[in-house]
Every structure is written in C-alpha cells, then in structure tokens.
Amino acid sequence: MSGVRFDSGPLPGGTLFAAPRMVIRADTASGVSPALAAIEAARAQGHWLAGYLSYELGHALMPKLAPLMPAGRDCPLILMGIFDGPRPAPALPDPAGVRIGPARPLWTRARYDAAVTAARDYIAAGDCYQVNLTFPMGADVAGDPLALTVNYCAPVAER
C-alpha cells in the first residue's frame, strides 16, 4: 500500500493519504485480532487510518461463518495504513484516450450455473430470502486506469 485516495472528505476536492508510517495487514483469521488491536492503538494515539476491511472479514468475525471462508482469496482481510494526516488530492488525469475493451466473465458457465443452483437451494431451504449473486469480470484497459475512473464518476444525464 502506497496510499489511499478519497474523492470526497475529509478535505474538500479530494483527499490523499500517502506514505503510510506503517501498514497493518491481516491475511488470515488468526491475524484479525492483532490487526484490529493495532488499528485501535494507532487511532488512540491520534493517527489517521485509511484502507479497507474486506467483505470476507465477516467470516473471521463470526464463528458460524468461519467454515465458509472462501479458499484461494487474493486480497487481505484487513489492509490499513497509518498516516500522519491527509493532504489535498491531486487532480485526476484527463480521461481522453482511455479505452476499455469488452467485459468478459471470469467464471465458466458451469460455475455460474452451479452458483445459481446453490442460491436457489438456500432460498428453498429457508436459509435466506435473497441472494446477491455476483461474479468477477475482466476487461483490457488502454491508457491510465486512474483516468478510467474519471469516466465512471462523471454525472450521467437521466433518460
């Protein structure tokens, strides 16, 4: 982690947290408690914290969900930087010339069908009343990926 950018707050016009004095990271359930303790200690000392807590962190925090922790995760459960303070974020790059290729699913049709079947089975069994089934997509980007975000943040006219 080299830094974290927020397009709004706490500073007007965007906020950048750069050059963390330390990075707190938990990749496994056993690393979660020490990471949370380190985060709280840094907060108590008056440091700024910026980073993320992954969705899968819930599996480590709730014993009932622990067996459902996805295997082969490729991102930490916790990744948090300790910073001295925020600074104004630099202007975003011009999005002209950035192109994104066609989106393609990163799951096979068989994997998708199996996930839909499992979701329907959970609902039918009364284990849940809805499922937000998502799956990863990929696309090739030509140009600066940060400039690509400018396109997605731009207001869109209502139809």
Predicted regions and their residues:
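Extended alpha-helical targeting/anchoring segments
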Residues: 1-159
